[in-house]
């Protein structure tokens, strides 16, 4: 199966892949999280520019959910292709208003050793706002090209 998710659908898919998937589950082939808050949500447990991604890809700050994902990282299915899409309003917050770029990009550290392919695409400007990302033509093109080319 291919899964395209928005917002909390990303962590829900990750949780499924790490904890609920079994031998009878469909094989995950492609995963496209859009604006996935894998390591915090602004106004809940994250603050703009509080966290950053180290040069090696590891997030400096890791919330409890992220730590639990990390402990189970070896259960992520091998051979999945991932396109991680996130937004940057370019207003100094390094976020899409609800999800920081660091939170979205923290997915790589969790699954980098398991995936066949991993890429990240930052969408910039007003149409990179959290709820507008899934209505964005640039995002539509990226998703279609990734899934069908």
Predicted regions and their residues:
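Serine-dependent carboxylesterase/thioesterase catalytic core
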Residues: 1-79, 96
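C-terminal catalytic-base region of ester-bond hydrolases, centering on the histidine
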Residues: 75-149
């Amino acid at each position: 199966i291919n899964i395209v998710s928005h917002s909390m659908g990303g962590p829900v898919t990750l949780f499924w892949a790490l904890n609920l998937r079994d031998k009878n589950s469909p094989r995950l082939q492609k995963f496209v999280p859009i604006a996935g808050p894998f390591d915090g949500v602004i106004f809940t447990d994250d603050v703009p520019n509080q966290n950053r991604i180290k040069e090696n890809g590891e997030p400096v700050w890791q919330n409890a959910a992220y730590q639990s994902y990390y402990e189970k990282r070896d259960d992520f299915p091998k051979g999945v292709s991932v396109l991680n899409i996130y937004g940057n309003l370019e207003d100094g917050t390094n976020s899409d208003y609800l999800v920081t770029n660091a939170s979205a990009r923290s997915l790589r550290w969790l699954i980098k050793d398991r995936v066949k392919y991993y890429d990240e695409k930052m969408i910039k400007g007003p149409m990179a706002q959290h709820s507008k990302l899934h209505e964005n033509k640039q995002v539509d093109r990226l998703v279609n090209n990734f899934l069908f080319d």
